[in-house]
Amino acid sequence: MKGMFFCARAVVPFMKKSKDGAIVNVGSIAGITGAGSSMPYAVSKSAVHGLTKSLAHALAPEIRVSGVAPGAVATRWWAGREEKMKSMIGSLLLQCIAEPDDVAKLICSLIEQESLTGQIITIDSGQTL
């Protein structure tokens, strides 16, 4: 979370000078649900979501700030736990685990969206519904 804050602080003067910019922070559904791999993880992701909303208020209208909250994503985090990942699929509305490319596409979309700020967008195949 500190890294996100310091990165934003470093880039804001340049974005304000150009009167345009977008920041997209990556949190997690753990920051929304309070459940995750550990309590500190969930709390830190909740802080990321709070930072995102606070920055959106502070930096508008020149800079848009949004967040992405991925659920399960097929990354190396699952190494050694592939069976657990596969067992989750049945409980997901879309019956699939997101790929890193899915998250990247959402981030790119948020950067291009000029009418959106302060929102945390969940990408979790319906896991939190």
UniProtKB/Swiss-Prot annotation:
In its UniProt record, a GO molecular function of this protein is: oxidoreductase activity, acting on the CH-OH group of donors, NAD or NADP as acceptor
Reading the lineage from the top rank, the first entry is: Bacteria
| InterPro entries assigned to the protein according to its UniProt record, in alphabetical order | NAD(P)-bd_dom_sf, Sc_DH/Rdtase_CS, SDR_fam
Q: What is this protein called?
A: Short-chain dehydrogenase/reductase homolog YusR
What Pfam families does this protein's entry cite?
adh_short_C2
What is the gene called? yusR
Species of provenance: Bacillus subtilis (strain 168)
Q: Which GO terms describe its biological process?
A: fatty acid elongation
Give the family this protein belongs to, as stated in its UniProt record.
Belongs to the short-chain dehydrogenases/reductases (SDR) family.
